[in-house]
Amino acid sequence: MVRIAGRELPTNKRVDIALNYIYGIGPWRSRQILKELKVDFSTRVKDLLVGEIAAIREYIERNYVVESDLRRFELLNIKRLIEINSYKGKRHKMLLPVRGQRTRTNARTRRGVKRIIDLKGV
């Protein structure tokens, strides 16, 4: 098992695909990392040399904020928006879309399941 940034990578996948399992590293960034370290994209994780694994691990830790650190950073940014009482903070607090999307229709994922109120007893 190869463990990078606190995450175990699947051994049978190509390296560029497997790096996507790390939160904060997408397809573009994984290829940039492999180009920088001169590792072939088509290499399987199980075929990586110990030195290559160590180089990838060190490069990611030195240059990128990933996994739990990135999640914490994002959460702190949202908390800051809520504390300063900004419009975006209010939208986060009310669990509504933040970036100007309409809410009269759609936004079902963010707002939750529609509930039908039974008014027979009233």
Swiss-Prot record:
Location in the cell: Plastid, Chloroplast
Annotated keywords: Chloroplast, Plastid, Ribonucleoprotein, Ribosomal protein, RNA-binding, rRNA-binding
GO biological process: any one? translation
Q: Which SUPFAM superfamilies match?
A: S13-like H2TH domain
Q: Which InterPro entries match?
A: Rbsml_uS13_C, Ribosomal_uS13, Ribosomal_uS13-like_H2TH, Ribosomal_uS13_bac-type, Ribosomal_uS13_CS
Name the Pfam families for this protein.
Ribosomal_S13 (PF00416)
For this UniProt entry, what is the primary localization, expressed as one broad class? plastid
Q: Which GO terms describe its cellular component?
A: chloroplast; cytosol; small ribosomal subunit
Q: Domain of life of the organism in this record? A: Eukaryota
Q: From the UniProt record, which GO molecular function terms apply?
A: rRNA binding; structural constituent of ribosome
Does this UniProt record's set of keywords contain Nuclease? no
Q: Partners and quaternary state?
A: Part of the 30S ribosomal subunit.
Record-stated family? Belongs to the universal ribosomal protein uS13 family.
Relate the protein's function as given in its record: Located at the top of the head of the 30S subunit, it contacts several helices of the 16S rRNA.
Protein name per Swiss-Prot or TrEMBL: Small ribosomal subunit protein uS13c
Q: Which organism is it from?
A: Cyanidium caldarium (Red alga)
The UniProt gene name for this protein comes to rps13
